[in-house]
């Protein structure tokens, strides 16, 4: 059912040169629908490599060309907004750490074909100690409000958000959502500790080996070890609470393929084990090796788990009715309905929760149910 989609991704990643056979018009249409939202432009990168005989019918090919061109144009616009934002923060003595997004695209065979979404950032002072108290974030948000006249949304604890030229920016106070999961408090501390080193006065000084320069001035990327923790946890949170897409899998696979030799694997695997994420890691690595034909050597310590990989893939291709991120602006009865529906969905998908969080499942279920009614 998904053979053509995966063969296109294999070609796009350089793991294959040709399709295995000639596919029907119906199969091409199905692959386009499957790919369109998250990996459509990436698949077009494969189509460009194929011989004319292997390509889709001309009418569908034109749709694919339009999709890829739209993505290329947005990517260039996205980069301009990113550069403008980084330059603005530099004037205020603030370094911009980029989470996900553009940094991951740099490892793709054709960076501009990776779908660009929000700009997720974490701000760090150029000098002085790093304090996890939100002061730098709020200082920067007020500067954006004052100088650019842009309204800042502050309703979420995890990050503020604002819109620049059609691009959503999320300015993070924490790297992951520490409000809903106890284990995320531990995970947040792993990420914070990698960012800093203690001084003689017990202040948190920036670990200079942590920040990696990007092609955009004052826009920094995190270390490979940090990303190995953050990216899997970030994808895992999407997976456990709702679902992930093939783009999440591609991001992880391409990241490990590009940076495996830079990762402190002893530390990373220790955290995966402690936080109960090994099964999720094994599932992702198996999808990458079995279905995308990536080299298993990049996924250090991973075990082939075809059973889990197939289960995760079935979930990826299952359509879920979207629910709002919060119950804000819902009526009282709608809030109750929202909480019940979301809790029932979570309970049905508790097998996913067990692959990501090291928590008591009944205690967490009750806590999340109450949280959904209140938020």
Model-derived segments and spans:
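Conserved NTP-donor binding/palm subdomain of two-metal-ion nucleotidyltransferases/polymerases, i.e.
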Residues: 1-117, 123-375
């Amino acid at each position: 059912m998904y053979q053509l989609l995966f063969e296109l991704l294999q070609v796009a990643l350089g793991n294959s040169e040709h399709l295995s056979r000639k596919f029907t018009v119906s199969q091409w249409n199905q692959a386009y629908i499957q790919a369109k939202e998250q990996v459509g432009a990436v698949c077009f990168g494969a189509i460009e490599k194929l011989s004319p005989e292997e390509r889709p019918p001309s009418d569908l090919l034109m749709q694919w060309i339009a999709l890829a061109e739209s993505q290329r144009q947005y990517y260039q616009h996205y980069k301009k907004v990113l550069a403008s934002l980084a330059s603005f923060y530099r004037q205020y003595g603030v370094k911009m750490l980029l989470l996900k997004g553009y940094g991951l695209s740099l490892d793709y065979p054709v960076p501009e074909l990776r779908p660009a979404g929000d700009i997720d950032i974490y701000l760090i002072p150029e000098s002085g100690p790093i304090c996890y108290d939100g002061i730098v974030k709020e200082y920067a948000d007020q500067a954006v409000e004052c100088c650019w006249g842009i309204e800042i949304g502050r309703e979420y604890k995890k990050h503020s958000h604002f819109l620049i030229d059609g691009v959503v920016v999320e300015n993070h106070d924490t790297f992951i959502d520490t409000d809903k999961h106890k284990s995320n408090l531990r995970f947040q501390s792993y990420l914070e500790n990698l960012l800093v080193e203690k001084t003689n006065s017990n202040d948190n000084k920036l670990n200079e080996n942590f920040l990696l320069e990007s092609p955009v001035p004052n826009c920094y990327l995190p270390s490979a070890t940090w990303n190995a923790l953050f990216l899997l946890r970030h994808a895992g949170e999407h997976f456990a609470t709702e679902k992930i897409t093939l783009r999440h899998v591609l991001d992880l696979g391409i990241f490990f393929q590009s940076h495996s030799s830079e990762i402190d694997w002893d530390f990373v695997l220790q955290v995966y084990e402690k936080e109960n994420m090994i099964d999720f890691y094994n599932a992702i690595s198996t999808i990458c090796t079995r279905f995308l034909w990536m080299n298993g050597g990049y996924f250090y310590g991973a075990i082939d788990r075809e059973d889990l990989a197939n289960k995760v893939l079935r979930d990826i291709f299952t359509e879920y009715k979207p629910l709002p991120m919060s119950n804000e602006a819902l009526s009282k009865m709608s809030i109750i309905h929202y909480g019940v529906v979301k809790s029932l969905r979570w309970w049905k998908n508790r097998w996913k929760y067990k692959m990501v969080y090291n928590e008591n499942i009944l205690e967490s279920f009750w806590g999340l149910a109450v949280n959904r009614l209140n938020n």
